[in-house]
Every structure is written in C-alpha cells, then in structure tokens.
Regions:
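Small-residue-biased structural context
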Residues: 1-178
Length: 178
C-alpha cells in the first residue's frame, strides 16, 4: 500500500474510534452501572478508568493528527514536488520522525487490564449479558487497536523514516550544488 493509503487508513480509524467505538463501550458501561440497584464499586472504578483511558486515547490521536500525520504528508508533498524547498525546510527544521516518535506513546495495552478485571469479576444474573457484551467490545477494540498500532509501528513509521532519510539526502545534495 502507498503511504497515502496508509495515512488514510490511520485517519479513518481515528475518526471511527472517537466517534463510534469508544461511545459504544461507554454506553455499555453506563448500562451495567444502571443494572445494579446500588452503586457497584468495581463498576464505578471501571467507569473512571475507562473515561481516563478515553481521554488519553483522544489526546494520543490528537497528537498524531497534529504533528506526525501532517509531517508525513509534508514529506510526501515535497517528494511529489508539490511544495518548494523553503516550505520543506520550514516543515523539517524543528521536526523529524525521531523527535515525533519520542513524544509518541502506546495506549493499546491498557484495555487488556480492564478486560481481565471484568473477566475475573462475579456478576449477578441480570447483568451477565451486559458483561459479556462489554468483554466482547473490549476484546474487539483491543484487537483493532493492536492492528492499528502494528500498521503504524511496522509500516507507516519505518516507511516515513525512510522517505525522510531519502529527502534529507536529496536536500543535502541540493545545498551542495548551490
């Protein structure tokens, strides 16, 4: 796949996660909480954990969409001669894939802890179906995030770094000739 296609996949999954997947899980947690007569301490902690996770994931996505993805798009534009040397220099002088990656964190693993806690929890009969739904949602989202992370870490980032290196060589050659 081209880098443009991979970038499109990353952006679309970000939108899907924020607009659909996270809301579905949050709704299931709300239904679970409401299914108990009294507040269930584990569910309240789970809800708090999930809201914090949702916020961290949104921050992670915003950082990628504010820095990493536009930077890669700029590299692609320069490669296709859609931006000039000055614009390329402005874009890259304070940025690099290495700098961006130093600020990049993995948020995929936290869902496993949440799911494992749920699996080990005793439920009452009226909420078993909701627990199973939530566990299935978490497993599915966890797998989806794993694939998303692998595409970023093993395809997008190495190819973007290679493109950056190639363009830096071209840029260095241009400077030598001028």
């Amino acid at each position: 796949f081209s880098l443009v296609t991979i970038l499109d996949y990353i952006e679309r999954t970000h939108t899907y996660y924020l607009s659909k997947r996270l809301h579905e899980i949050e709704q299931t947690i709300d239904l679970l909480i409401k299914s108990y007569d009294k507040s269930h301490p584990l569910l309240l902690a789970l809800n708090s954990f999930f809201l914090e996770y949702k916020s961290r994931l949104a921050t992670h996505i915003k950082a990628e969409e504010s820095f990493m993805l536009p930077y890669i798009k700029s590299l692609l534009k320069f490669e296709k001669h859609e931006i000039n040397v000055q614009d390329y220099f402005v874009t890259t002088k304070d940025n690099s894939m290495d700098k961006i990656l130093n600020a990049h964190d993995d948020v995929e693993l936290d869902l496993a802890k949440m799911r494992e806690t749920l699996v080990s929890t005793e439920t009452h009969e009226t909420s078993k179906t909701l627990y199973r739904i939530l566990i299935t949602q978490l497993e599915s989202f966890e797998k989806d995030l794993l694939v998303h992370g692998l595409v970023e870490d093993r395809v997008l980032i190495p190819r973007a770094k290679q493109l950056e290196e190639n363009l830096n060589e071209i840029f260095s050659e241009m400077i030598r000739w001028n």
